[in-house]
Structure formats: structure tokens, C-alpha cells
Amino acid sequence: MKKRVVCLGLTLLLLLNAALVTALGNQGWYLVLRSADTGQTYGRYPMTEGDWFSVGFVHSVNKSPVIDCYEIKHHSIYVEKTIYYNFGAGVQTELEGNETLSYGKDGAMIVSGFDREMSDLTYFVGTVSDHTLIVNDGEEISLRNLCGRSSKVRFTYEWLWS
């Protein structure tokens, strides 16, 4: 009888331990994409300090690619650089503060040195051309497919329990 109680107790302890590992296994820091209008979660991607992500799109006026690059620092999202290929309305033409301009081998203009926290990072998903999220491992996610055309998408960096 005593053996049976001990075995039952150990079995329950192992089951409880497995349940805790499963429940806590998905907790951590995530890049979270939500509807800025409804709060609906579109997606979440695990990230840690020092990880990068970018959002690419085709500029609506000059019809060339633009890539905004962000880094996770101090548990926040920081814009670090922008890559673009043509000047046009809404494209930076002057450098400020510690910003620098360099050129890529493909002719890209790279403005870096922003190092600016983005407390409210929101994108409007294009109707004519898509916006693409690129996360750590190079995975490309179509924001049009994930969120829908004309969606207003808010990016946050959050601790999530599950």
C-alpha cells in the first residue's frame, strides 16, 4: 500500500512538472504585431536583446524599395537605419545628429545612426504593394497576407506568458 501511494505521488509530481514545463515553455520576449484599431494580435516572433528585424516596402511616390531596420535594445524597439534607392517625397534628404550616409554595392543609400526609440511604431499595410517583415533568421512575412490590405499595424516588444 505504501509503495502504491509513493508511486502515485511520484507520477502526479512528474505530470505536474510536465504541465509546468509546457505552460512556461512559450513565455518570453516577443515582437508582437497587433491591429492598431482593434488590438487583435496578428503575429508574434520571439526576440531577445540585440536582435534585428526590418520592414520593407515599395515607396508610393518614387516606386523603389525602402527598408527600415530596427534593433531590440533596452526592452524597446529602436530604429537604426533606413535603406533606399531613390529620392522622393517623404524620403530623407538631410542628415541630422550622428546620422551617416553610405552606399551599398547595389547602389543603395543607407542612412544609419538614428538610434531612436520607437514608442509607437505603426505601419499602414499597402494596397498597391506589400509590406514585408523580415525577422532574425531571414524569414520573410507578407504583412498583406498576415494582416490584410489597408491594415494599421502596431509593433511592440513585450513579455508574454504563453
List where the protein language model places each region.
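Aromatic-capped interface at the extracytoplasmic side
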Residues: 20-35
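Exposed beta-strand and adjacent loop surfaces of beta-rich binding modules
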Residues: 28-30, 52, 67, 130, ...
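Positively charged n-region of N-terminal signal peptides that target proteins for export
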Residues: 1-4
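Short, surface-exposed beta-strand-loop junctions and turns on beta-sheet-rich folds
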Residues: 61-62, 85-87, 117-118
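Hydrophobic alpha-helical targeting segments used for export or membrane insertion
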Residues: 10, 14, 31-32, 36
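N-terminal secretory signal peptides
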Residues: 34-83
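Hydrophobic membrane-insertion alpha-helices, especially the h-region
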Residues: 7-24
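Mature, soluble, non-transmembrane domains
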Residues: 80-81, 90-162
